[in-house]
Curated annotation (Swiss-Prot):
It comes from Streptococcus suis (strain 05ZYH33). Residues 10-22 have a biased composition (Acidic residues). Homodimer. GO terms for molecular function: adenyl-nucleotide exchange factor activity; protein homodimerization activity; protein-folding chaperone binding; unfolded protein binding. It is found in: Cytoplasm. Residues 1-29 are annotated as: Disordered. This is Protein GrpE. One of its GO terms (cellular component) is cytoplasm. Its main location: cytoplasm.
Amino acid sequence: MSEEIKNEEIVEEVEATEEVVETPEKSELDLANERAEEFENKYLRAHAEMQNIQRRANEERQTIQRYRSQDLAKKILPSLDNLERALQVEGLTEDVKKGLEMVQESLIQALKEEGVEEVATDVFDPNLHMAIQTVPATDDCPAEHIAQVFQKGYKLHERLLRPAMVVVSE
């Protein structure tokens, strides 16, 4: 009997030792799996971040391309205004007037090709117009409508280059 008890104790000790040995191996495996999962998450985040950076860079490039002519258009607009004023002067010969109109039309066409267009001047919109004066409303010009335009406004695609300077009826 004592041999059986000793054998049982030895078997129990061996099983206990095996359990102790299995636990560290299993925890090392778990740690390795956790680290692998952590690295995979970091990789996925870094990959997503790179995609976001590329997307933002593409959007920025497209925006720059779309509005590349903004500065030039702002510099040309005063010349266009001067041509319009010159055409309003009385006493111009037909040849001079026709020449000025041709220059004006070519400038307007060049600006249109770049996406520059005149701001509508029907109903007053504080986002597009600058009210420099108000006048009482009449039958011809109801309230919140533009009675007179002092300077035309322009926008490049949906971006305002210059607000129209207007007289608004109230």
